[in-house]
Amino acid sequence: MYSRSELLLLLAVASVLTGCVTTPPYVYHYIPGRTATLENGYAVAPPTAPLPVTEAIDAGNELIGKPYRYGGGHKNYYDTAYDCSGAVSYVLHSIGRMNTPTPSKELRDYAQSGPGTWITVYASRGHAFLVVAGLRFDTGYGGREHGPQWLTRSRPADEFVMRHPYGL
């Protein structure tokens, strides 16, 4: 049996150790042949990308120009407007990696933990975005909401967990 002071010390050490884990910010790094590029707001897959990655980029491109709407893409994958997790769900569904539109906080438990080789889901309790072949697919940051778009602009991710589809 542990004494009260030993238990408090263990609790303090555990809280410090778990508090040290933070998700690094998203920062775009171009790697020739491995990173997607942008042309007029649309993503172009790198030549070495596997088929599911190319399909994910194509699916994200289908949503470019759609407006933002809270709850958009949740009743049906095919909607007239999308919120963050609706857009993420649409892309993952298009590559056969999601069966039901999923809210941001539930994406925190999606598939495998950690960053993916090609696709990473960043999820917090209130927002989600994707990074596909190095490009960020997002609906908002900095107090502004907009429809789904591909971005190279950096953003903090300290409130997010990183998850990825199996094998990607």
Segments and roles (model prediction):
Residues 1-8:
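Bacterial N-terminal signal peptides that target proteins for export
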Residues 8-18:
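Bacterial N-terminal signal peptides
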Residues 2, 16-67, 143-168:
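Intrinsically disordered, low-complexity
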Residues 61-81:
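Active-site nucleophile-His-acid catalytic modules used for acyl/amide transfer and hydrolysis
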Residues 76-95:
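Active-site nucleophilic cysteine motif
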Residues 13, 62, 90-93:
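Residues within well-ordered alpha-helical secondary structure of globular protein domains
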Residues 49, 57, 89, 93-168:
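...with weaker cross-activation on analogous glycine-rich loops/strands in unrelated enzymes
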Residues 42, 71-76, 105-110:
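Short linear capping/connector segments at secondary-structure termini
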